[in-house]
A protein has these predicted regions:
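A catalytic-pocket lid/entrance helix-loop region that shapes and gates access to the active site
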Residues: 171-203
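Alpha/beta-hydrolase fold catalytic core
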Residues: 2-71, 95-97, 136, 320-323
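Conserved hydrolase catalytic core segment
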Residues: 137-180
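Conserved serine/cysteine hydrolase catalytic core
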Residues: 223-287
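Catalytic histidine-centered segment of alpha/beta-hydrolase-like enzymes
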Residues: 299-309
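Active-site loop/oxyanion-hole signature of alpha/beta-hydrolase fold enzymes
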Residues: 104-142
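Catalytic histidine neighborhood in serine/cysteine hydrolases
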Residues: 286-301
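Conserved HGGG/HGGXW glycine-rich cap/lid loop of the alpha/beta-hydrolase fold
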Residues: 57-109
Length: 323
């Protein structure tokens, strides 16, 4: 009986050893593919706009349309390819305006960076990239989500460069508690590891076109098939240390901005997604002051995916008041 148990134990240990070796081999293969073949697929996609030098690294600036006003779209956290993500909104807004998307370091076609992800650095990178692309202020900033923090900071530091701000379901800078718990940061770090061994690619391969459409990525919402395909490819490369640090610094960024007075010369329109219309928005509007107004649109946090026409009309009305 003892010999039998000993034999069974050895077989189990051998099986476990084989499984571990198999998993290690799979991870090594996945890591190699991620760094070579899959990366070459990504690099085959040409930037939609212009690459400019910022702090000796490349940043992507995508411009469309002409007009008296320049609208600058700034992406939310971790959006894989903002230039494609914002494309339907850009096409709608560019009918009467110059519209620009700035891709931060760590997303889209832009390089990654080790430079601290602070409000000051984001502001300087936005200003420098636009200047290098020959796009001069003043601007109407149109930030989504976390970029609202950087836009408010920008307006307090250089109000002469900011003609107005249209917030797309932006992060509230009136928050007093931590925005993201530590377990979310840990989840991002785990996702980065999954990405590096190509597991993320495997998991994303199960996402159907119907699921993408439900999240707003559809021809009916104004996307081209190329934009949808490019976004899907970039989803496999969306996790990196630059955006993880951005997430980790969110609370610090909010705390730095929340006590800075918004200049009275900068009007603000806050567009709120119906799913996020709660007390946080009221607190935020109080902080923004008397020169701020709000509109609630039906939709999710990525409100610009399916409300491009309404956002465009609200933008026209906002600009009419500026003039």
């Amino acid at each position: 009986m003892k010999k039998l148990l000993s034999k069974v134990g050895k077989i189990i240990l051998l099986a476990i050893g084989i499984i571990i070796i198999f998993l290690i081999i799979c991870m090594l293969i996945g890591f190699t593919l991620h760094k070579t073949y899959y990366k070459s697929q990504l690099e085959s996609i040409k930037p939609y706009g212009e690459m400019v030098n910022v702090d000796n690294k490349n940043m992507h600036v995508y411009s469309m349309g002409e007009g008296e006003n320049t609208i600058v779209l700034l992406p939310g956290h971790g959006v894989p390819l903002p230039s494609a993500d914002f494309a339907p909104l850009m096409r709608e807004l560019s009918k009467e305006n110059r519209v620009v998307t700035v891709e931060y370091f760590g997303v889209g076609f832009s390089d990654k960076t080790d430079k601290p992800r602070t409000n000051e650095n984001y502001m300087n990178e936005i200003r420098t990239s636009l200047n290098k692309a020959g796009i001069k202020p003043p601007y109407i900033l149109m930030p989504h989500s976390i970029s609202g923090i950087y836009s408010e900071y920008y307006a307090t530091k250089h109000p002469e460069e900011v003609k107005g701000i249209i917030l797309l379901d932006s992060t509230s800078t009136a928050l007093t508690s931590k925005v993201f718990p530590k377990d979310i940061v840990s989840t991002y770090k785990a996702a980065k590891f999954q990405q590096e061994i190509s597991l993320q690619r495997l998991l994303l391969s199960f996402i159907s076109d119907e699921t993408l459409e439900k999240n707003g990525y559809s021809i009916n919402n104004g996307y081209t098939q190329k934009e949808i395909d490019d976004i899907k490819k970039y989803m496999n490369y969306s996790m990196n240390n630059t955006i993880i640090e951005q997430l980790e610094n969110t609370f610090t960024s909010v705390q730095e901005v929340k006590d800075l007075p918004i200049p009275e010369s900068v009007p603000i329109l806050k567009i709120i997604a119906s799913e996020n219309n709660d007390k946080r928005q009221e607190e935020h509007l109080k902080r923004l002051g008397n020169n701020a107004s709000s509109v609630v649109l039906d939709g999710t946090h990525f409100i610009y995916h399916n409300q491009t026409e309404k956002i465009s009309k609200l933008t026209d009305q906002f600009i009419d008041k500026l003039n």
